[in-house]
A protein has these predicted regions:
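Short sequence/structural segments immediately N-terminal
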Residues: 1-156
Length: 156
């Protein structure tokens, strides 16, 4: 069971769905998470799959909805995928808020930030975020993928 679950954490598995390869992956390749001076590459699972086992199982169960969407044709073309991006992105963002951006905090923490090394804007925003108990995704929603446009009818 664990072996199969870990196989679904690979970049290859994530990209086996052409909607992921043609859309989010192409955006991700243009970010610092993909290519950077340190050579540390963040993968899909680093941001989208929790490390604690029980949270990982819950995420995998929730991911079955995305597979269902693919199988039933709801997001089986680029056009359909993009039509549902707002809904899909908000699901991810809501989950990250609920977990206090747990996956971000696997690598980042306010306590480890050297604010004096940040530019004035980042220093100010990070200090305010700590004071206001904000979580990473509140400011960094577009860090790995383009933020989708909110639909005219935001009840979607």
């Amino acid at each position: 069971f664990n072996t199969a679950m870990e196989m679904t954490n690979t970049m290859g598995f994530c990209l086996s769905c052409h909607e992921m390869k043609n859309n989010p992956y192409e955006e991700y390749k243009e970010t610092i998470l993909f290519k950077n001076p340190s050579g540390v590459q963040v993968t899909c699972a680093d941001c989208h799959v929790p490390r604690p086992w029980i949270h990982k199982v819950v995420r995998k169960i929730k991911a079955s909805r995305e597979l269902w969407y693919k199988a039933t044709g709801k997001i089986d073309t680029d056009e359909k995928f993009n039509a549902h991006r707002w809904e899909l992105a908000n699901r991810v963002w809501d989950s990250m808020r609920e977990s206090d951006s747990r996956e971000c905090r696997n690598c980042h923490s306010y306590e480890s930030m050297d604010l004096s090394e940040q530019d004035r804007s980042a220093r100010k925003r990070h200090s305010r975020a700590v004071d206001q108990e904000q979580t990473c995704i509140d400011c960094h929603a577009g860090i790995a993928h383009e933020e989708p446009d909110e639909p005219e009818d935001s009840s979607q």
